Amino acid sequence: MKQALKNNYLLIGTFVCFVVALEMLRAPVYGGTLTVMLTCVPGSYDFVDTLLPMFVMLADAAVLSLPALFVRRRRWIVYAWIALFCCYVAVERMYMHVYHDAMPFSHFLLWGNVNGTLLRSAGGLFGAGELVAFLPLIVLIFVGRKLPEPRRYGRGTVLSVIGCALAGYAVGAAYNVSRLGRNYSITQPYTTMYKACGYICDNGFVPYVVYSVVTAVTPDRLSDDDRRRIESYLARQPRYTDNSYASPQRRNVIVIVVESLNSWMLDRTVCGVEVMPHVDSLLHREGTVAALKLLPQVKDGRSSDGHFIINTGLLPLSSGSVATSYAHNRRYPSLARALKRHGYTSFNMVCDQASAWNQQELAQALGFDRFYDCTAQSTGDDLSDEAMLRAAVDSIAASPKPVFAHLVTLNTHQPYRAPDSPTALSRVDAPRRVAYALEAFHRLDAQIGDFLDRLRRRGLLENSIVAIVSDHNDVDLNELEGREPTVDDTYCAMIVTGTVVTKSIDTPAGQVDIYPTLLDLAGCNDYSWKGLGSSLLRREPASAAYCDGTLIGADRRTLEAWDVSRRIIKGNYFAK
């Protein structure tokens, strides 16, 4: 036995390294098999449902260990292969902590996104769990220095390892069939992906790689079936053309997209301090339309997905980013294009660099006339929200009227840092992350108040519609209250002031409903593209859905919209 371990230490050690790394990859979202079995009380979990997915993990580890069968002298090749995978796991774990899903492989090529904000975020997320994946590799390298070259393996061993891996995947496939029942084909779990982390846990990491490669190289074409499904959905959409909720005068349209704003921060006092008093004052003003129960519908593109939803009324992809994969040479119907028909000029202003999330190319696809990033106002460092908002006032004043200004904040992006001048908000009985987030939004609120004052002093505010919308959620209400999360904790916000309507929408809706609502308020209902949502002024919303199947309400058309949007984007429907 001892001699067998010595002869096979590289193969065995490599296999163990990948088992641990794969376990750490699965743990953040769904909970790894070994993690659950070691940390949970027996009887508190379904043993079979927990154990069977482990066969898929072992199959993955066997496939990933295959290089160890062909290496003898150059063991560093195997060590480098393991280290590379461990680095991948560490990055994915940090991504999962924020986005609750695995990062698509295409995002690893987005070097333009690497900036100070991203590096600070990564530093705040890196913890002991990310280091655990590397520990078996360190032990393997240390032990390997004292042992002779590993044995040479023949074809039979290679075939045996591959056979064991296939057996593990077969167990996983059988489990999927029994779990899903007769309503799904045996291939459905492998050809349809709602969440990447779920695909990895259910089907395996190696099948996930195969799926990602196949979908990346398969050309996207709009089939006749795609067109029928799209047009069937659109035929059932409301087709109103009146502008009953718009001012007869053409007002400037100013949209402030607030980074990571959860609606629970509005109309809330913590430790005697009103978190966002300036924005709160808008909620209770005549001419304000407010919806504070918007289900966040962003996915892998996060902020860029939010911008895409708000400007087009389309939903993002359930895997991948529209901004990085489907913005080049595209022309989407949008707010900017709807307003341009009525003589509006437009610009998009952001705090970071144009290359981050491919923002400039997305802005072109959305029809903006001008795009300003941090290089327009500085040497290339990210702008503060305060500096961006002040620059925006000058740009609005200098633009031909009417103007559509799309302004994107950044400083409330996590990780939240200790404030230079803390208020009583820092004394909240909650994790530091929550306290620092409250302080960050309190500061941003003051900057938004200053922005509105500057518009007022220059005679611009009284002739403008100002919309404040969330790009997505981040610090959910359960984190403040110290309890298990619910969907209600994630709600985002839309506040539009300067309109001829006063209305508060108290029922849940989706981010996809922002676009048709803004069309309604801006008097652009002659524009043929109304989006996949519904104007919140036309009827009380009944439902909202997320791509993982989460449904609020009973209208399943909101789930269907995800499939329709995917077909529109991937098939380049608007190029017809």
Residue ranges and their predicted role:
Residues A68, V89, Y211, G313, ...:
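Short, hydrophobic/amphipathic alpha-helical patches that form generic packing surfaces
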Residues N7, R73, S121-G124, T215, ...:
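Membrane-interface junctions
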Residues G172-R250:
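Membrane-interface segments at or immediately adjacent to transmembrane helices
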Residues K2-Y208:
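Transmembrane and membrane-interface helices of multi-pass
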Residues L52-V56, N115-L119, V132-P136, C197-G198, ...:
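Generic detector of well-ordered alpha-helical segments enriched in charged/polar residues
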Residues R228-K576:
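Solvent-exposed soluble domains appended to multi-pass membrane proteins
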Residues Y99-W111, R120-A128, K195, P207, ...:
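General structural signal for secondary-structure boundaries
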